[in-house]
Amino acid sequence: MKFKHIVWDWNGTILNDAEACAKAVDDMFKKRNLGRVTREAYRKKIVFPVIKLYQESGFDLEKEDYQVICDEYIENYLKYSAETTLQKDAVFVLEEFRKKGLIQHIVSASGSDILKNQVSYYGIGAYFENILGQADNRADSKVDLARRLIGLTGCKPGEMLFIGDTVHDYEVASEVGFHCALVSNGHCNAERLKATGAP
């Protein structure tokens, strides 16, 4: 199968921000006396939609407003992500795909404003035809965004390769019919990714 489109996840796949996310979550756990979260512990725990992470970790969502929790995470994340970089060779790979005539897009659980600001900051916006993020900062499922991308491109799902770094990326690809490839240097550890059976 010759792919026509490459669909990228952003956080952890192109942007090397797993450490920043782990620190943001760690601050939230410490505040609530729920223990500590290292980078490796985070990579074992992270699930989408992210509300599941909070529910499974002991956050009392009957007493705490979920939107306030999301806002707290974003405040922490923006503090720690200021020093993040792109993944090694990310620009090289983007350029190679561009040279091959592949059309590239981003589908992200990140809020659209933060996503577009980060893409602009790193100067790589020209590589992407569509940059799709969430309307809010709740890090919900990306399935609807993937379906929206299919509509925008008019391309058959089977002609699209989704490259991500989480089990959820595999789930999204499977749900909408994309092919999927996963990288293990992002938000999920290799053991969890191997269990999906994706390359």
Segments the model singles out, each with a brief description of its role:
Residues F3-F92:
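N-terminal helical cap/lid subdomain that shapes the substrate entry/recognition surface
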Residues S108, L161-P199:
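Acidic, Mg2+-coordinating phosphoryl-transfer loop and its flanking beta/alpha structural elements
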Residues Y42-K45, I124-D140:
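A short, structured active-site edge motif that brings together acidic residues
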Residues Y122-L132, R192-P199:
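Structural recognition of alpha->loop->beta junctions
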Residues L78-I106, S112-K116, V143:
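Short, acidic loop-to-helix structural element flanking the phosphoryl-transfer center
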Residues K2-H5, K142-E171:
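Conserved Lys-Pro-Asp/Glu-containing loop-to-beta segment of HAD-superfamily phosphomonoesterases
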Residues V91-K99, I150, Y170-S174:
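Surface-exposed amphipathic alpha-helices with a cationic face
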Residues G35, G125-E129, K156:
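Conserved H-loop
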